[in-house]
Structure formats: structure tokens, C-alpha cells
Amino acid sequence: METVVNIIYTPSNSREHIGEFSLSFDGFDGETRTVRLKFDIKELWSFSRDTSSVAFDFLVLSMLVYNVDRAIKRNRYSIDGWHRTIRMANIPVINIDAMNIGKDEFERAICFLTGDAWIFDFIQSEGYEYAPTNTPSYKIDEYEEISLFSGGLDSLIGFIDSAHRISQNKKVLLISHMELGKEKRDQVDILTNCKNNHILDGKYDRLLLNAGLKPNSWSTHSATESTFRSRSLLFFAAGIYA
């Protein structure tokens, strides 16, 4: 039982926006479903200033995997209620030769991560005319470590450890992700408490990636998968990109 998900990319008319990605696939009931995706990378881009590297291709791939993982509900798109076979078609990448070299490794690693079978079909991207204005500037040499900051207890402990481990006058760069809103509230609550109580003052900055399904953009209302197994991949990709 293979589900083929077509990736559609629509370029933006403005350099302020990266463009829009959407998914299209045949539903379990035979009806074609489409959904648009959020992919707001402005804060990450303000640090890396990059849309042409293999790291950016990996970020795009990870964002798409995360959204496909959410869109394809296990109990409807698998024989046993869990293990899905998903083919992602027309994944746009800048560095297609490098991505094809890594294709088998990507598939094996993500199959292990989510417990599914994934097949990736890459196509050559024409690139992105993305250069948003009103972005902060960063001095990269001020940062000694990157810490993935979800707002959960494990990532909070990792952040605290990093902040105490780094050299004097250096900072930790926190990388966060939000989709549903609750994640951001948890992250903000923690950092607001740090600020109000002068905890780790001057020891960190945070960049937020807003990526996920646009819930009101489904062509046909669909229940989404809630196991979030691929979210860690998106975090790693965002950290590598930054």
C-alpha cells in the first residue's frame, strides 16, 4: 500500500517570501487531497543568509518529510495501522547531484526514525529569490554552540548545560520550531522567566522556524497524524542550516 505524495512549489512574486509548498495525494477514499504548508524561515535566514547550500536542501527535505508525516494518518494509509509506505515525488533541490548521492542514506535514516518506508524522488530546483528586509544582523563568531530548544524538559536541560559550558563572552544559539502554537507558548514562557529573573543574561539568542500544515487549506477535511516522529529531523536540519 504505497501513498504517492506530489510536492508542488509555487515561487513568490516578492523577495520577502520564500514561496509556497503544497502536498497533493490520493486519499484512502480515492479522493485527491491537497494542503498548503507553512515555511517561514525568516529568522533562520537572517543568521545564515543562505538558500543555495546542501544544508538548505536538507532543511527543505526535512520540512517536507515532517509535513507528509503529519498529513498521512497511519491508521488510514497503512495495512497494519502503523507502517506506511510513502513516495515523495518532485522534491525540489538546488544541489541535485549531492542529494541523490545521499538519497539512500536519507531514506534509511528516516525509515528508522518514523518506522515507515520512505522513497524520495528529487527534481532540479530553479532556486529561490529570497532576500527579506528588516532582519537583524548577527556576528557569527559570538556563538559557540547551537542548542535545539523545543520548550520541553529535555531541551531545557540541554540549553542550561550549553549555557554553562560555553566560554566567557560567548553565546548559545537556540533553534526552535512551532506549528500548532502551544510549542511557542512553552518556549516563550521559559525564556520570559529567564529574562525576568536575569537567568543566563546575554548568554543566548533564539531563532524560530514556523513550519507545518496550514489547517484551513485542506481541499477536503482530513484528520492528521499526531505521533510527530519526524519532528526531531526538522530540528536537526534547522540546526545544521543555521
Please annotate each region the language model reported.
Residues 1-147, 160-171, 175-186, 190-215:
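RNA-binding accessory domains that recognize and position tRNA/RNA substrates
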Residues 144, 214-242:
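Conserved adenosine/adenylate-binding substructure
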Residues 147-153:
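Short, glycine-rich nucleotide/cofactor-binding loops
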Residues 154-158:
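Hydrophobic positions on the alpha1 helix immediately C-terminal to the Walker A/P-loop
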